[in-house]
């Protein structure tokens, strides 16, 4: 789940003799090193070459965003492929290495901003162009599979993953989904040599989580539909549009339906969609009957990470081999995040998993490798990867800027303060605190951020941006003509902690501590959380600057 080059640049990976060192590209296994735990139980962020050479894992999830040179990512991909080729020469299976990635921001607005921009002019050309630009860079550096886009239609403002959606309108999200499939897969006739494999998520729509909680943890395991037909009307349309344009893969959600009266039963074309209280990756009704047979999905199904060990809602009493068997027989082709194929072997040997179901899963997943011609020529040129980033990323800056302008609405311009006069002195004050969930992920991604306050780095970035535009930045409000407040709420590592809802709270909140990543039971302790650091200072600062006119 956490695959990133040891160092971000080729210069750092090159020794005094001018040769690249493999150990600075792909981490070498150190038997004495204690594995670093990941953000969820049973997962590690200590990924090294033993995962390929000993466990024969043929894929990983890249977490370096744009921090690593494109050429370094290509070299990491090549190293993984070469290790697999070495194993194949000893009698293993010749499968090229696959690097997955979550969506990486290349300067365009994030998802909600994309949704806002599309609503603004009703045009998705910008979305298609963004996807085409990103596709070319991804292919050049070996990022062949995207865990995205997230086409959940948000229906509860408390849900912490709303920021990753395109908003609350099914029609807008559907239009965006179509443009993304065409752009990333290089057409709408399925995969080809130029395609990035898209894994749209989280089927059949994860937004109606009970009370807005997130299903990575048990407190958020239930999907509650409040009205008849809401799944078909609001949550399924973006998936249907993606299926119509031959999206290559889907990722089911962790959550499960509630059948105890809390939710209204959901139908699709007049038939009940599902009755079994299990996560979607375990539901044959949803994966095979609904997605494949009724909605026409024709790709492979990739589960989210940890469904056999962590998010085991409703299958707690099954053994791990039984869980694998149930998920695969339900129609899931790839079990994400796990590195224990022995459980699949045992499921077959014990008669739990029909060999035909395993063959179907293997065929569906391998088909994407052949359709994108990765088996024929798996190695990449790092120089071409670097050049592809220069050509596409730099070339997209103007369009990305225009997209950001479309995504932003000026709510207020008191006394025509904007645009600022270049003669005005600006003081920058930031309000962003410590996000423990982000810090955990940053540590896993090798960013070296740790659990730190990001205000200093944020102020530095903003100062440079203002000065580049010709403004004078001063240190204190007393010196300033204009006070720039950069307000950035955080969610207290919400996905993994569930301490608070992701809304701006006016001050600190004292709440019950819960077991992180486990049962979410209350520990008996209290914790203090705040989504907006030092919020009480905003009025004080505003009064001070207004007093100066």
Specify the residue positions occupied by each region the protein language model found.
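Glycoside hydrolase catalytic-domain context in secreted enzymes
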Residues: 1-549
């Amino acid at each position: 789940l956490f695959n990133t080059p040891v160092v971000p640049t080729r210069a750092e990976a090159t020794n005094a003799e001018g040769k690249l060192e493999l150990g600075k590209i792909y981490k070498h296994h150190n038997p004495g090193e204690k594995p670093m735990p990941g953000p969820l139980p049973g997962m590690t962020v200590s990924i090294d070459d033993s995962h390929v050479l000993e466990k024969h894992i043929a894929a990983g999830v890249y977490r370096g965003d744009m921090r690593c040179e494109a050429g370094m990512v290509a070299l990491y991909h090549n190293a993984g492929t070469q290790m697999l080729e070495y194993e194949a020469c000893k009698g293993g299976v010749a499968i090229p290495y696959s690097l997955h990635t979550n969506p990486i921001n290349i300067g365009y607005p994030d998802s909600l901003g994309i949704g806002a921009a599309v609503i603004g002019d009703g045009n998705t050309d910008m979305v298609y162009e963004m996807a085409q630009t990103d596709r070319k860079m991804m292919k050049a550096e070996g990022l062949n599979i995207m865990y995205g886009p997230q086409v959940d239609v948000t229906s509860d403002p408390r849900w912490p993953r709303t920021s990753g959606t395109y908003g609350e309108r099914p029609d807008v999200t559907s239009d965006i989904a179509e443009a993304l499939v065409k752009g990333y897969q290089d057409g709408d006739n399925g995969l080809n040599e130029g395609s990035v494999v898209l894994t749209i998520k989280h089927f059949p729509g994860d937004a109606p989580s009970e009370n807005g909680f997130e299903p990575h943890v048990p407190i958020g395991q239930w999907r509650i539909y409040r009205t008849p037909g809401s799944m078909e009307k609001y949550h399924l349309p973006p998936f249907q549009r993606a299926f119509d344009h031959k999206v290559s893969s889907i990722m089911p959600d962790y959550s499960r339906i509630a059948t105890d009266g809390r939710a209204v039963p959901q139908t699709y074309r007049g038939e009940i969609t599902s009755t079994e209280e299990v996560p979607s990756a375990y539901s044959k009704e949803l994966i095979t009957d609904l997605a494949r047979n009724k909605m026409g999905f024709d790709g492979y199904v990739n589960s989210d990470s940890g469904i056999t060990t962590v998010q085991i809602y409703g299958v707690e009493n099954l053994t791990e081999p039984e869980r694998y068997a149930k998920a695969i027989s339900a129609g899931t082709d790839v079990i994400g995040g796990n590195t224990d194929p022995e459980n699949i072997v045992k499921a077959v040997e014990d008669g739990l998993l029909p060999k035909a179901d395993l063959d179907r899963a293997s065929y569906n997943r391998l088909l994407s490798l052949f359709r994108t011609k990765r088996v024929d020529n798996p190695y990449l040129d790092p120089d071409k990867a670097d050049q592809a980033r220069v050509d596409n990323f730099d070339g997209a800056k103007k369009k990305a800027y225009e997209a950001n302008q479309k995504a932003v609405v000026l709510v207020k311009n008191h006394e025509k303060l904007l645009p600022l006069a270049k003669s005005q002195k600006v003081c920058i004050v930031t309000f962003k605190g410590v996000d423990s969930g982000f810090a955990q992920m940053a540590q896993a991604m090798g960013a070296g951020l740790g659990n730190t306050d990001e205000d200093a780095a944020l102020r530095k970035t903003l100062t440079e941006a203002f000065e580049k535009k010709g403004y004078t930045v001063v240190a204190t409000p007393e010196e300033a003509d204009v006070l720039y407040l950069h307000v950035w709420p955080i969610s207290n590592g919400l996905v993994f902690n569930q301490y608070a809802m992701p809304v701006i709270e006016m001050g600190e909140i004292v709440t019950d501590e819960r077991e992180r990543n486990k049962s979410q039971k209350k520990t008996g302790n209290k914790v203090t959380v705040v989504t907006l650091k030092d919020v009480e200072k905003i009025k004080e600062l505003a009064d001070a600057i207004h007093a100066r006119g």
